[in-house]
């Protein structure tokens, strides 16, 4: 058996984290890592105390969830950021994994942060965002988080 690279290792953990999601369409997992240590994890799920997605009629409608701006889920990245302190996140890496609930296969867009999550990631001081395609965002010398790869939709 081949030993996974460090990025593969953390992406595998992000996949395992995603399996906690109750979403009926897609599972997302996020792992925040700093200096080789996991500081936080998150998966897409409704806010604490609210009904799980199993009761969501939007998912049962057969429509593409991207059209549902009112989806109650808190994104994986948001949950990971909420669970970590700002000092821990400064300079940390964020690993993202996304999977289809039906097939268990990685989703085509390879787990990219939405615009709101990207704003939170920038403000949290996260240094890099990594998905299956590799490093997709990285903070430049001027401190700005910039895309390194084009998003696939």
Please identify what each model-predicted range represents.
Residues 1-27:
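Short, basic/aromatic recognition patches
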Residues 2-5, 12, 39-153:
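Zn2+-dependent cytidine deaminase-like catalytic core
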């Amino acid at each position: 058996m081949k030993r996974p690279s460090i990025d593969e290792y953390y992406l595998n953990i992000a996949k395992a984290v995603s399996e906690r999601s109750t979403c009926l369409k897609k599972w997302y997992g996020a792992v925040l890592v700093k200096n080789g240590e996991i500081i936080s994890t998150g998966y897409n799920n409704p806010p604490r105390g609210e009904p799980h997605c199993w009761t969501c009629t939007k998912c049962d409608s057969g429509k593409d969830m991207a059209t549902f701006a009112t989806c109650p889920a808190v994104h994986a990245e948001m949950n990971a950021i909420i669970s970590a302190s700002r000092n821990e996140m400064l300079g940390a890496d964020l690993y993202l994994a996304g999977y289809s609930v039906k097939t268990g296969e990685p989703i085509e867009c390879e787990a990219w942060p939405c615009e709101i999550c990207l704003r939170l990631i920038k403000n949290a001081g996260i240094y890099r965002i990594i998905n299956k395609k590799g490093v997709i965002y990285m903070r430049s010398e001027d401190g700005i988080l910039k895309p390194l790869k084009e998003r696939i939709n």
